[in-house]
Design a protein with these regions (language model features):
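Short, ordered beta-strand-loop transition motifs
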Residues: 30-33, 45-51, 92-96
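Bacterial Sec signal peptide processing site at the extreme N-terminus
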Residues: 17-35
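Sec-dependent bacterial lipoprotein signal peptides
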Residues: 1-20
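Short, solvent-exposed mixed-charge patches
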Residues: 20-21, 173-175
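Short, solvent-exposed, Trp/other aromatic-anchored flexible loops in extracytoplasmic proteins
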Residues: 83-142
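Short, surface-exposed binding/anchoring microloops in extracellular/periplasmic proteins
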Residues: 40-77
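Short beta-strand elements
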Residues: 127-172
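Detector for glycine-centered tight turns/loop "hinges" at secondary-structure junctions
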Residues: 27-28, 32, 65-67, 82-86, ...
Length: 175
């Protein structure tokens, strides 16, 4: 009986002691657009120094499960980073419901800091046209803690540690 208790206590300690921190980086506009979800995706989302891969624009009504098609009315967007302007061509040749603007594939390498995107006009499937203002993007970080052993056993152990601007996270964790 004593051996079983020791094994149980030891198992509980091992299962609870194994935790892993994971970080995911992305860019979001400072200004929220009421009807659209806009995000900058990093090429390797768990690496702080990975370049911006793409900017996606999605209709927030998609959250109910039904997809709503968006159309970018411009054939390019403009990015401004550190005073330099970049023109990124856009084509919806794949006929996606959402808008994907490929930044890195078009030779623009944004790794750190913020930037401004001039996306222009977006047409909803209702016919409404939204003229997006210049959007100021900043890099954000999502830090989570989870137990891989318990997650394997279908126990959701993920805890959100931080979700916000990378500058705020770095200030918070400075010793």
């Amino acid at each position: 009986v004593a051996k079983k208790i020791i094994v149980i206590i030891f198992s509980v300690l091992i299962f609870n002691a194994c935790s892993v921190y994971s970080s995911y980086y992305s860019y979001y506009p400072v200004e929220e657009i009421k009807t659209l979800a806009i995000k900058g995706t990093i090429k390797n989302g768990d690496s702080k120094n990975s370049p911006l891969s793409s900017i996606s624009v999605e209709d927030k009504r998609n959250l109910n499960g039904k997809k709503h098609k968006l159309t970018l009315l411009n054939n390019s967007i403009k990015l401004v980073k550190d005073g330099k302007e970049y023109i990124i061509p856009y084509s919806n040749s794949n006929n996606y419901e959402d808008i994907y603007i490929y930044i890195y594939k078009n030779g623009v390498n944004i790794i750190n800091g913020d930037f401004i995107a001039y996306i222009g006009k977006v047409k909803l499937d209702t016919g409404e046209i939204i003229n997006l203002p210049p959007l100021h993007f900043k890099k954000e970080i999502l830090v989570e803690n989870y137990n891989p052993i318990l997650d394997t056993l279908n126990q959701n152990t993920t805890k959100k540690i931080f979700d916000g601007l990378i500058e705020d996270y770095e200030k918070r964790n400075k010793y």
